[in-house]
Amino acid sequence: MSNKHMKPTGFEDITSDRISSLPDEILLHIMSFMTAREAVQTCVLSTRWRYIWLCLRCLNTEICQFTSKKIFVRFMDNILLRRGFVPLDSFSLIGWRDDVSLNHPRTNLWVCHAIRSNVRVLQIFEYHGLFDLDHSFFISSHLKILNLRCVSTTALFIEKLFSGCPVLEELSMVDCRVFATKFSSSTLKKLTFISHTPHGEDCVHDDFEDLVIDTPSLVSLHLEDLPLLNPCLVNVSSVVNASFRLDEESFASSDVNCNIISALSNVTKLKLYFGLHNIGASGLPLKTDNLESKATNISFNCEHLKKVKIRCPRGDKRAQNIVNVILANAISPPEIVIDQHTPWE
C-alpha cells in the first residue's frame, strides 16, 4: 500500500498540532518573543490562531520589517485600533533603518495608547536622528521601566515623568539629548544616563551646570558622557553598583565639588572610566590639577566597597589620585584594577 493511503498512527494523530492545542495563555507567552508583525501573521495558520494576537500583552515593533514608513504607520494604526485597550506588559518601538525613522506625528499617539493600556515596560529606540518625545501623557500608576535611545526631552519631561509615574523603578536614557539638570525620584532603583554628544558637538548646555541626582531608593547608577555637567549626588547612599565615564570637562570649575565617590557610602562595586579629549604632544592629559586638588580633600565612608575598576588613558594621574583617596578611607582594601589604554584604543 502506498504511503499516501496509509492512516496516521496514534502517535502521529496526537502530535499533529500540539502547539495549537495549547491554552491561550501559553500561546500568548510564546508570541511575546515575536515582533508584532510576526505575531499578527500567525492569524493565517488556522481558525484557532485567527484572533489570538488581539490579546497580546507584549508588542515589539521593529521598523526594519517594513518597506516604507507609510506601511509601518498603517500597520501600527491598525494593530492598536483592533486590539483596543487590552492591558500591556511591554511596548517597544525600535527604529533600525536610515530611511524609516520614528519621527512621525502619530508616534507619540502610539506611546500615549500604550500608557493608557497600563504598560509596565516602555521602550523607544531610535538610531538615526533624535525623536521628540511628548511629556504630556506620561501619567501612569503602572509604568515601572522606561528605556529610551536617541530621544530628545526637556527638563519639564523629567519633572513630569517622576511626578506622574509614581512607581517608576528603572530609567535608561542612552544617546539622549536631555535638557535637564535634576533627577529627583523616591522610587527609582536603576538609572542609566548617557548623553547625546556626537563628535564632541551638539552640547546640551551652553554653560557649566550641576546635574543633581536625588534618588534615595537608587541601587544602580550609570552616568556617561556628560558635557558641561558636574554630577552632584544627593541621597544616593542605597547605591551598591555605580559606573561613571567622565572626561575632563566633567571636573571643570563648578559651585559644587564633584562628589561621585564621597556620596556612595554603601557602594560595593565601582567603575570609573576617564576619557581624553585634549591630548598634548606627549599623549597625556592636559588637565589634572583640578581633580587632584579636590581628591586630596575627600573624606568618605566606603566600608562596603569590595571592587574598583578604573579605565583611563595611559599615564593619567587621576587614576592614582582616586586610588589614594579610596585606600585612605577604606576599612579593608578593596580589589582595585587599573586598565590603562592608549588614546587610539
Regions found by a protein language model. Give the residues of each.
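C-terminal capping region of solenoid repeat domains
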Residues: 1-13, 253-254, 269, 283-290, ...
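Leucine-rich repeat
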Residues: 2-187, 194-196, 326, ...
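Short coil/turn segments at secondary-structure boundaries
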Residues: 45, 173, 224-226, 235, ...
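Solvent-exposed loop/turn tips at the surfaces of repeat/solenoid architectures
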Residues: 96, 127, 146-151, 171-176, ...
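A structural signal for leucine-rich repeat
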Residues: 108-113, 134-141, 159-166, 180-189, ...
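Segments adjacent to and within acyl-thioester-processing domains across lipid
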Residues: 243-249, 257-266, 271-272
